[in-house]
Amino acid sequence: MNSLANNGKLYLSLKKLNFPKEWSYPVNPNTSYIIDTFKEAVKCGIFLESNKKHFEYSYSILTVIGWFFPRYNYEQLMIASSVMQWIFVLDDFLERDHIDDEKQQYCVNKCEDILIQGRKSEYISNIADADLAPLDKYTLLLRDRLSKSTKDRVETFNIFIHYLREWFFSVIPLKKSKGESKSDSVHYDVYTFIRTVNVGLYFVIAINNVAVDLKIDGSFWMNPIWSRMTRNASRLFTIVNDCVSYAKEIDQECAGENCLYILQIKSNLPLQTVYNHLVDEFDQIVAKVQKDEILLLESFNYLPNEKIDGIKYLILSLKELLVGNYKWSLVSPRYIHKDSPFIETSRSDSSTIPYETILTPDIFWI
């Protein structure tokens, strides 16, 4: 792989991906949600409490919540962490090579229907509680938590479910887009279009709509300036995530879903040149987000302060997510790899967990 410079020395740094200095946010000091979220998944049968690797898997996922939502209280953190744990478990399941197309599609359709209808879903309505598959139990738990938080705000619940289902319906198309061979790569523009949804920023920012009573109209989520901001922010998410996962995805022969690899193959350029191109794009997109922040607030200057405050909360949260994702990615064991071309994530660590091998289908799916 073209990840090392001459003599095997690392030559790339993720510090070239810069955010404005004023975008500096602390990590949420509350960490009690981590063990509580893990225990809920254990109760549903997703994990085994006695299995150390299961806890490490869960812990590595849930730590991101503290980086994403530094202002959340415990109850809000529990909402966000249950969403994130559900997402990662489902994503890791769908990306397994031994899960055929039919089972993947069945899984997606089933999750969608349970989120929409709950216990009335035709997939589980005739199954006793004790006989439900672990992931079904956890999906019901998640839906119940979301419903309780939005019991007087049905519109906000529907908006969040919309973004959530958009995400999990993007997983299979992205996987299929690269062709039959694992090393194939999709056209870059096609990849960017699918990955904008698949990277997950839309549903992550929409967690605020469930966890926080923002006092804003549902129509705000369709505002073209806000839509452009979140689309551009999704691109920033993608660049960071693809950089830190580059070596791992090449190692697992699934780099056809990685923007660095796609640009290398399609443009026949060395990794360093491709990375410099992405750094330039990153800087340009950050500037666009800053410009749209001003435009967005100006376009709503007629609203009462209560609603303006809700919009300002979301804008700040968007920036917290961007910075939090970047900082978390640099320290998460999920992205450590001995062949990483980036100094910050390249090392051999005996404690690093091969996440793709931890959860077997019989543990969390029947």
UniProtKB/Swiss-Prot annotation:
Motif DDxx(x)D/E motif in this chain: 91-96
Keywords: Lyase, Metal-binding
TM region(s), chain numbering: none
Gene3D superfamilies registered for this protein in UniProt: Farnesyl Diphosphate Synthase
GO molecular function, one term: metal ion binding
Chain segments annotated as coiled-coil in the UniProt record: none
The name this protein goes by in its record: Terpene synthase 4
Species: Dictyostelium purpureum (Slime mold)
